[in-house]
Amino acid sequence: MKAEVLIYAYLAVCAAMIGFNIACIFVFRVKDKRLDHYSRRFIKIVHQVIEDQTVTEEHCKYLSKKLKKINNLMAFDKALEELFPQNPKQTKDYIRQLSSVFIYLTLEYKKKSEIQAAYFPYIIKKYKIFQGQPIGIVMDILLELVHSPSLYVRENALQVIYSIGSVECTMNALWILNE
């Protein structure tokens, strides 16, 4: 009798795991569709701004508001990935003009969870947003992220610091890691 109870318990656990996996599949499909929808919206907006060749203050405010949410930042990243092969020079110019937006977002993502805080420096590094221009407040926040207990946050923050090219900030980051 005890063996039968154990088998039924094992069967119930297996059924629960299968149910959980099926539910996850549906949830991830919905999230992927939502991400694609947001990405298409960003593609239209960014493509229009690139064609006009001017980033307006209104557009910067819109992005500052929208990109505070991690799902919108992921959709924006996906949109830029699609636009880069089509117009590499114009897209780079567009991203350079958004440095004020990314300075603001640096302050916002500093307050977020570790996973979100790790993703934001990845975006900065990926598109080389602050390359060659070490901005004080951004560098201070990146150095704070180097203190993080999360390996992903530290790694991405260090990669951004290295890509910016500031010797002083790189040395400070190495001192922080050494402690």
PLM features per residue range, with description:
Residues 97-103, 135-139, 170:
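Core helices of alpha-solenoid repeat scaffolds
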Residues 51-81:
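Acidic, Ser/Thr-rich low-complexity segments on the non-lumenal side of membrane proteins
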Residues 112-113, 149-151, 179:
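Short inter-helical turns and helix N-cap capping residues of alpha-solenoid HEAT/ARM repeat scaffolds
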